[in-house]
Swiss-Prot record:
Induction: Expression is regulated by the heterotrimeric G protein pga1. It comes from Penicillium rubens (strain ATCC 28089 / DSM 1075 / NRRL 1951 / Wisconsin 54-1255). PANTHER family: DEVELOPMENTAL REGULATORY PROTEIN WETA, PROTEIN ESC1/WETA-RELATED. InterPro entries: WetA. Residues 49-72, 104-165, 236-295, 367-453, 471-496 are annotated as: Disordered. Residues 237-251, 262-295, 436-453 have a biased composition (Low complexity). The gene is wetA. This is Developmental regulatory protein wetA. Keywords: Activator, Conidiation, Sporulation, Transcription, Transcription regulation. One of its GO terms (biological process) is conidium formation. The keyword Transcription applies. Residues 63-72, 104-114, 155-165, 252-261, 367-401 have a biased composition (Polar residues). The keyword Cell cycle does not apply.
């Protein structure tokens, strides 16, 4: 049962809706025409009253408006047998199919369960008394669009904005139900008056209360319908003149849903929970009406504007987790992959689709924030230049880890190059000690003046510590005689150099004793 505050608020909103419909003589209110083609006013008006809905049939023909004639069923038997809309979507055909195929025990249950709202406004068209006595879920289904419309007008949104978010909610809620019922919409000649994005709750609740044999009968033509439905249902009709936020959001939703294949959009991967709309939604029993009437519709239909914003936040909320999962892969990926993808991923993030190119741009700006509006183009340019230069200098190495590590790519590049530099200089020192051995002999000469003469002692290796000791094992020849002779020659040369240095110091008037103390 519905709660009393919900009934009163809905009665006011419903009266507002009825007054708007009767005041528009042409019947083509742009904000309401797409609702009216999928939601019949006959089942709505007969189900939303506080009194039991016992309304006579001729009221259906009293209103001279053209929309009532447009809604009238062309051929009840044909529509009930084939379940195909003719030129426009006739909601009375849908209700007639439900009327002919409903089982009898579902009628008193639903009629007693929904007879608590205030009195019915008199200006809406009516169906037969059997149709009036029958309570389909369309009354409940029509309450949510009315609530949506009023709340969205208060919040300056448009109805198609709300319906498109509800479409994204409930489209993936029932994969089997949505697949089977979506295939039964043969919308062949209806581009002129087709709504932008019909609420899928019309399909879902009907399928919930359809008998299984009719579902199995309609399951035959399931091959050619969904692509046609996706291609044509979301085209903007020329007769619907929507306000600009509605057009923008519907275009965005159109790109979003056409980009998704029907198979992937029918999976259970919807970020919105189906329990916001239907709490016990997984049975096709008509008696399950009483279990989801009371609270979930009250919760979901009275808070539509926060529900829309929550829907958007839920839709984008898995993105940081996906970025966190794929960020490690991108941190260790080769350089050209990251740079090219970061340049290519600067597209508009609200394009929707399958979100193929989101993660590289998220990875580039993940150090700053995960918000989708922080796509700074300077960040990938900085990374491009640094990574390219590092690849020129150091081709065999993969790029540095990430800017998150605290060091820029140039720092890590210099560090990686400096390590081979140290190795090269060390090896040069080692080879210099073996190949360029005579060079230290200059510094270890007898004096600074005599060091230019010490080049002749090229076969002796002097170190920094044994300047007074001649090394014996360095001679290239292996003979002991040659070794002893060269050592003797070295001693003689050193003695001669020392004497020459002493003579030079004496001739210059220097301190000979100090020099002898150093040399000897």
């Amino acid at each position: 049962m519905f709660a009393q505050p919900y009934d009163h608020s809905f009665n006011d909103l419903f009266n507002q809706y009825v007054n708007m419909e009767t005041s528009a003589v042409d019947g083509k209110d742009s904000a309401l025409s797409d609702f009216d083609q999928l939601f019949p006013l006959d089942s709505l008006s007969s189900d939303c009253g506080d009194l039991p809905p016992t309304v006579s049939t001729p009221k259906r023909h009293q209103s001279p408006q053209p929309w009532s004639n447009e809604w009238s069923l062309q051929d009840d038997g044909a529509a009930a047998d084939h379940f195909a809309f003719h030129d426009t979507v006739h909601p009375s055909a849908i209700s007639d199919v439900n009327l002919n195929n409903f089982e009898v025990p579902s009628r008193p249950t639903a009629s007693h369960g929904l007879s608590t709202s205030p009195s019915t406004p008199p200006a809406t068209p009516r169906r037969k008394p059997t149709q009036s006595a029958l309570i389909t879920p369309k009354s409940i289904r029509h309450r949510s669009p009315n609530e949506r419309r009023s709340h969205l007008r208060k919040q300056s949104f448009s109805p198609s904005l709300m319906r498109s978010s509800n479409l994204s909610k409930a489209r993936m809620a029932y994969p089997e139900a949505w697949a089977q019922r979506l295939q039964n919409f043969s919308l062949h000649g209806s581009e002129d008056r087709l709504p932008l994005s019909p609420p899928p709750s019309d399909v879902l609740i009907q399928h919930e209360n359809m008998p299984t044999e009719q579902i199995m009968n309609q399951h035959g033509d399931s091959a050619e319908r969904p692509s046609q439905y996706d291609a044509r249902l979301y085209q903007q009709s020329p007769s619907v003149s929507m306000p600009s936020p509605s057009i923008a959001m519907s275009a965005r939703q159109q790109q979003h849903y056409i980009a998704q294949p029907s198979s992937s959009s029918l999976t259970n991967s919807s970020p919105s929970s189906a329990d916001d709309i239907f709490s016990s939604s997984h049975s096709s029993d008509p008696h399950s009406l009483s279990s989801w009437q009371s609270d979930p519709l009250h919760a979901s239909s009275l808070s539509f504007t926060p529900d829309l914003q929550g829907q958007d936040s839920q839709w984008w909320s898995p993105m940081p987790s996906r970025v966190a999962q794929q960020q490690a892969a991108y941190l260790t990926s080769p350089t050209p992959v990251r740079t090219m993808q970061s340049v290519g991923s600067q597209n508009d993030m609200m394009q929707g689709g399958l979100m193929i190119q989101f993660n590289p741009s998220y990875d580039m700006s993940a150090d700053h924030s995960f918000s989708s509006s922080n796509m700074l183009p300077a960040t990938p340019q900085k990374f491009d230049t640094s990574f390219n230069t590092s690849q020129v200098h150091n081709v065999s190495r993969s790029p540095s880890l990430s800017p998150k590590a605290g060091t820029s790519p140039r720092d890590t590049r210099n560090g990686s190059i400096s390590k081979p530099t140290h190795r090269r200089t060390h090896s040069r020192k080692l080879s210099g000690q073996s190949m360029n051995a005579p060079k230290p002999a200059k510094a270890s000469g007898s004096s600074s003046r005599g060091s230019n003469k010490s080049v002749s002692v090229s076969f002796v290796n002097f170190t920094a510590h044994d300047s007074k000791k001649i090394l014996t094992g360095v001679a290239p020849s292996g003979s002991s005689k040659t070794k002893a002779r060269r050592e003797q020659e070295a001693r003689d040369r050193r003695r001669k150099l020392s004497e020459a240095a002493l003579r030079a110091v004496r001739s210059a008037g220097g301190d000979v004793e100090a020099l002898e103390a150093v040399l000897c």
